[in-house]
Amino acid sequence: MKHGIRVLGIDDGPFIKNSDKRTVITGVILKSNLYIEGISIKYIDVDGSDAEDVIISMIKGRFKNEISAVMTDGITFGGFNIVDIKNINEATGVPVISITRREPNIQRIISAVSRYFPEKVDRALKALSNGPVRLDNIYINSAGISLTEAGILIRRFTFMGRLPEPVRLAHIISTAIIRGESHGRA
């Protein structure tokens, strides 16, 4: 793997349930030497269906030729704004890795989607179809990259804690945009 590899880390900001209509989604492009190449800040609908298109637009933005891989904090943004990492990979040609700290309870997720967003059940089932794989102390899904290569990339970009630095920085920035300062665990 090259030393100058760049990863786009993506996470959303907090929102007030049943009140906020939109929330921020931040992308941080980080080189493996910890140099921040760029930041992309956009907004998505809470419980909407635009997060996938917004993420694709981030990847196809100004730094499109420099992004080697994308890492996301899960597959839901702004509540139940569900993304399918396979679709993102197919639309951009860039490998995508979804990361969560805890093993997703797929049955519980589908039950919640069925109850509150029945029109999104098929999308959720498709997005969750290849299930999470445990890697060290996190769970990942990947598209366009082997699990072995995904593991190498994640370990290369993880310096402290469990989340890779690009995702951790995206979380910190998104939270600061909404709350005025970073807060909580990244």
Curated annotation (Swiss-Prot):
Gene3D superfamilies per the record? archaeoglobus fulgidus dsm 4304 superfamily (3.30.2170.10)
| InterPro entries assigned to the protein according to its UniProt record, in alphabetical order | Endo_dU (IPR002802)
Q: Name one Pfam family in it.
A: DUF99
Tell me which domain of life the UniProt entry assigns to the organism this sequence originates from. Answer: Archaea
> Which protein family is named in the record?
Belongs to the UPF0215 family.
Annotated HAMAP family: UPF0215
Q: What is the protein name stated in its UniProt record?
A: UPF0215 protein PTO0905
Organism encoding this protein: Picrophilus torridus (strain ATCC 700027 / DSM 9790 / JCM 10055 / NBRC 100828 / KAW 2/3)
